[in-house]
Regions:
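Short beta-strand His + acidic residue motifs that chelate non-heme Fe in jelly-roll/DSBH
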Residues: 111, 119-124
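Non-catalytic, conserved peripheral segments adjacent to functional cores
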Residues: 1-106, 125-127, 134-183
Length: 183
């Protein structure tokens, strides 16, 4: 597994070693020891989540606050998505900046998003199955979110805005300036 830290300290792109032959392929998708050595910290995952979405679905930008903050290790089992993490750590040099990573079943790339970040994704393929591990349990009272098209963030989703499919809840999320503080 190859680990590459992004411009956002603590966010890592993971590229697995894929062994292919005439039968198909094999890869190790997760190894706790390798993972913790690769990101340089101990993270223990307690929950796995999976979603299925169609082309144009944009989910996010979501996060959990305070003691319920979550780190996530995300990947795509089928299809292709643009995955986005936004730094919400107030003391960070990259506060308010984002990283976008193309995740697909073909490239098998994974993205580690630590605590203190908002997270969202846009489905680029006809359908996509999205899978992620969390290091903390979901807590409804601690959920936060930021509007996907916040002008301060200026995220380039590179997708026709009229074709986006967004939940009513996500359409009315606050902008970064008015969002619930992560800590």
């Amino acid at each position: 597994m190859k680990f590459t830290e992004t411009k956002l300290k603590g966010c890592f792109i993971l590229e697995p070693k894929i062994i292919k032959d005439e039968r198909g392929y094999f890869m190790e998708s997760f190894n706790e020891k390798t993972f913790q050595e690769g990101i340089g910290q101990k993270v223990t995952f307690v929950q796995d989540n999976q979603s299925f979405s169609t082309r144009g679905v944009l989910r996010g930008l979501h996060y959990q606050c305070g003691e319920h903050a979550q780190a996530k290790l995300v990947r795509v089992l089928q299809g292709e998505v643009l995955d986005v993490a936004v730094d919400l750590r107030p003391e960070s040099e990259t506060f308010g900046q984002y990283e976008a990573v193309l995740l697909s079943a073909e490239n098998q790339t994974q993205f580690f998003v630590p605590r203190g970040f908002a997270h969202g994704f846009l489905v680029l393929s006809e359908t996509a199955t999205f899978f992620y591990k969390c290091d903390n349990f979901y807590n409804k009272e601690s959920e936060g979110g930021i509007l996907y098209n916040d002008e301060t963030l200026n995220i380039n989703w590179n997708f026709p805005i009229q074709d986006l499919i967004i939940s009513d809840k996500d359409k009315v999320l606050p902008n970064l300036q008015n969002a619930k503080k992560v800590w």
